[in-house]
Amino acid sequence: MNGGAERAMRSLPSLGGLALLCCAAAAAAAAVASAASAGNVTGGGGAAGQVDASPGPGLRGEPSHPFPRATAPTAQAPRTGPPRATVHRPLAATSPAQSPETTPLWATAGPSSTTFQAPLGPSPTTPPAAERTSTTSQAPTRPAPTTLSTTTGPAPTTPVATTVPAPTTPRTPTPDLPSSSNSSVLPTPPATEAPSSPPPEYVCNCSVVGSLNVNRCNQTTGQCECRPGYQGLHCETCKEGFYLNYTSGLCQPCDCSPHGALSIPCNSSGKCQCKVGVIGSICDRCQDGYYGFSKNGCLPCQCNNRSASCDALTGACLNCQENSKGNHCEECKEGFYQSPDATKECLRCPCSAVTSTGSCSIKSSELEPECDQCKDGYIGPNCNKCENGYYNFDSICRKCQCHGHVDPVKTPKICKPESGECINCLHNTTGFWCENCLEGYVHDLEGNCIKKEVILPTPEGSTILVSNASLTTSVPTPVINSTFTPTTLQTIFSVSTSENSTSALADVSWTQFNIIILTVIIIVVVLLMGFVGAVYMYREYQNRKLNAPFWTIELKEDNISFSSYHDSIPNADVSGLLEDDGNEVAPNGQLTLTTPIHNYKA
């Protein structure tokens, strides 16, 4: 009975090891399943994703025998949990010549070096005494490679065997015991492998617009084949240099100008980022105020702040302001000059277009401009004065009207500048414009002033020409014949009188002649009006002439209404107011009343 109990006690370690082995297998299966889902399996002590297929050395320095390979996915699961314990199968007492096939299986579930080893019990055939007296120790053996048998997951990768070397653990020395038929090693149950399932078909989910083929992609990465201008795993976004056109829903190229754009990519609306002075959706032209589109962009217009725009190709300024002109608005227009101060402002010339050409210029050493050219009759820096031989007439210089009777050498001005009156008339002329002859001179057919001549009769019948001057100064010589003298004197005086009247008429000016004519016309008109008035009065007098005495009352109206009188005296006898014998009805409705008072009836 004691032997049976002892055998039962000895079999307990074997049963415990078997239970531990089952637990280790379950833990390994769970780890393999999680690793298969992640796509990675890590060998014990190895790098991630690497498989060590080399067999380890056998026990006691003997060559190792190859183990059957177990399939496992190459992907390694991330190590996120705590270190896992390595479970060892219980070792049975073996002889030194034992085959390596009886080497215990080491199942590793992680890189942890913690080892749990079941205690080795004595052989059931070994007596206790021998166990106590045995001093022989077994040589330490090198750990044998352990092959982990796992089931393949749904990953499409090719399963390979993963060899995990077991950590070196000193073995407990066991005494060499004779083999006995009673001692037996529990057989290790074979590992069962789950049947592998075929990999499922990969769904591409490529973009209909951006991919070449909706159902064609890389089965490993899932990358679709994109059209030009598209990118992304499913070709769902636009590449750099392209933008999404919301109208068509397609990725279109930006087409930004390399000269005018700061960068080739554009924004989501397709607008490029332009350089300074460049405009346009693709930055391909210069904006107002810039010119010369090139690889450096556009240059600002050089218009001296007098124009806001210029020609896009040549840079010539357009619409120059502030009375300026030129390609860069650097000059002043006609009739303007550039001020000498720092502003360089274009100011209007102080030159009238009536007196000059209107243009002016200013010298570098002067502060006031001068007119370039004055018209005839004007002088001065601003052409505002009359030249010699001209006079001011209502702010206009007119030429002196002296008819050539003033010497311009002796009298340069010829006439007074303020009034135009001729100065120093020559050629026996006088007057405001030298239009008259001096006393004793008359105009000839050519308009010159010549002396007057008088024809005097002689006793012999001939005539003598005597000038007016000689007549006024000489005294006639008396003659012997007394009868001839009065005749001669009368003739002389008559001739002198006629000559004086002619001279008087010659001295009458045109203005005076006009006044005389006007006066005569007025007198004639007044006389005609008086004559017409007299005729009218005479006819009226004839029409109103009466046969009655002067005290007769005249009634001017033929129809006289007596309605008021009849209303006041309804029973009055109008015919009895006057005597039939003593009153007569005057013609034209006139009523004549006689003087006797008794002719009226009460």
UniProtKB/Swiss-Prot annotation:
Ranges of compositional bias, category Low complexity: 68-85, 139-166
Entry's Gene Ontology cellular component terms: basement membrane; membrane
TM ranges: 515-535
Residues carrying covalently attached carbohydrate according to the record: 40, 182, 205, 218, 245, 267, 305, 428, 468, 481, 500
Skewed-composition ranges (Pro residues): 167-176, 187-199
CDD domains (UniProt xref): EGF_Lam (cd00055)
UniProt keyword Cytoplasm, yes or no: no
The entry's keywords: Disulfide bond, Glycoprotein, Laminin EGF-like domain, Membrane, Repeat, Signal, Transmembrane, Transmembrane helix
Segments on the Extracellular side according to the record's topology features: 31-514
Positions of region (Disordered): 38-199
Subcellular location: Membrane
PROSITE patterns: EGF_1, EGF_2, EGF_LAM_1, EGF_LAM_2
Cytoplasmic side: 536-602
Annotated disulfide bonds: 204-217, 206-224, 226-235, 238-251, 254-266, 256-272, 274-283, 286-298, 301-310, 303-317, 320-329, 332-346, 349-360, 351-371, 374-383, 386-397, 400-415, 402-422, 425-434, 437-449
Stretch forming the signal peptide: 1-30
Membrane association type: Single-pass type I membrane protein
Domain Laminin EGF-like stretches: 204-253, 254-300, 301-348, 349-399, 400-451
Parts forming coiled coils: none
PANTHER family: LAMININ SUBUNIT ALPHA-1 (PTHR10574:SF409), NETRIN/LAMININ-RELATED (PTHR10574)
Name of the featured protein: Multiple epidermal growth factor-like domains protein 9
Taxonomic lineage: Eukaryota, Metazoa, Chordata, Craniata, Vertebrata
